[in-house]
Swiss-Prot record:
Keyword Repeat set for record: yes
GO biological process, one term: conidium formation
Protein name, entry field: Conidiation-specific protein 6
Species this chain originates from: Neurospora crassa (strain ATCC 24698 / 74-OR23-1A / CBS 708.71 / DSM 1257 / FGSC 987)
Superkingdom of origin: Eukaryota
Region feature Disordered, mapped onto this chain: 1-93
Basic and acidic residues bias locations: 27-37, 77-93
Signal peptide segment: none
Cellular compartments per GO CC: cytoplasm
Family, similarity comment: Belongs to the UPF0654 (con-6) family.
InterPro entries associated with the record: Conidiation-specific_6, UPF0654_domain
UniProt keyword annotations, A-Z: Conidiation, Differentiation, Repeat, Sporulation
Gene that specifies this protein: con-6
Sequence repeats: 7-37, 59-89
Function: May protect dormant spores from desiccation and play a significant role in the formation or survival of microconidia and ascospores.
């Protein structure tokens, strides 16, 4: 039975990537996940921490600007975060 049978392949691969970063998972499970990712043609960088970055380089500029605009209008966001969003928006224009 395939890992992808009747499942969204991106979700399956995402689960295997998460397995590699989970400290509560056995080495055997991590090896299996690494093999699945390699067989699927997914490049895995072991130096990657799995954390997201704040680099907006590959993102849709319209979506990035929209997110910053939403931050400015959200009453639950701190003044510091709003100031940061304003600076980022000014840099996009």
């Amino acid at each position: 039975m395939s890992d992808f049978e009747n499942k969204n392949p991106n979700n399956v691969l995402g689960g295997h990537k998460a397995t590699l970063h989970n400290p509560n998972v056995s080495e055997e499970a991590k090896e299996h996940s690494k093999k699945v990712l390699e067989n699927a043609g997914e490049a895995y960088d072991e130096s990657s921490s799995g954390k997201t970055t704040t680099d907006d380089g590959d993102k849709n500029p319209g979506n990035v600007a929209g997110g910053y605009k939403a931050t400015l209008n959200n009453p639950k966001v701190s003044d510091e975060a709003k100031e940061h969003a304003k600076k980022k928006l000014d840099g996009l224009e």
